[in-house]
């Protein structure tokens, strides 16, 4: 593909400041299913995380990208792990950090995914009908449980990523 060729040329001519380093990144949104056809997500495109993964790879790093659902092409030369939910992202990141603790260490974990803050307390197995007496409202108290934070949790268990850079959205767009 022409874009892959251009990427390889860019990588070839980029100084290898990260040669020999291992980078773990998260990117994109997460999707918390309400039922088989509805869910809670956000408008994250994943562009920042994918661009960081590409830049680190160009600079010589070995990069693993854990990504929620996006419409972006997978960055060339990057190990890709696709996930949907916040729990899946947390599990994938934890597995990578556990693997790193037992074999080859990760030099940097960059968490830029827009991980869901909430999830339904229980996913319905069938589409919830419109005239339902009690739709599963997403509100702070009722059928909502906190979603796991894939950027906050991994560094809390003495893993190599004890200092985890993450970029939260603190203002409305």
Predicted region positions:
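Glycine-rich phosphate/dinucleotide-binding loop and adjoining beta-alpha-beta core of small-molecule
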Residues: 2, 57, 62-173
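A generic local secondary-structure boundary/capping motif
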Residues: 12-15, 97
């Amino acid at each position: 593909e022409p874009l892959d060729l251009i990427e390889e040329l860019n990588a070839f001519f980029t100084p290898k400041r990260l040669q020999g380093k291992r980078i773990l990144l998260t990117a994109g949104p997460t999707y918390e299913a309400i039922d088989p056809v509805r869910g809670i997500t956000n408008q994250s495109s994943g562009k920042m995380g994918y661009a960081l993964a590409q830049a680190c790879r160009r600079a010589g790093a070995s990069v693993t990208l854990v990504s929620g659902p996006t419409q972006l092409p997978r960055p060339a030369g990057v190990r890709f792990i696709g996930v949907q939910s916040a729990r899946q992202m947390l599990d994938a990141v934890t597995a990578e950090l556990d693997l790193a603790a037992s074999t080859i260490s990760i030099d940097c974990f960059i968490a830029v995914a827009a991980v869901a803050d909430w999830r339904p307390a229980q996913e319905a197995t069938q589409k919830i009908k419109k005239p339902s007496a009690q739709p599963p409202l997403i509100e702070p108290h009722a059928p909502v449980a906190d979603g796991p934070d894939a950027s906050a949790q991994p560094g809390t268990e003495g893993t190599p990523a004890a200092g985890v850079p993450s970029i939260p959205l603190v203002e409305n767009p």
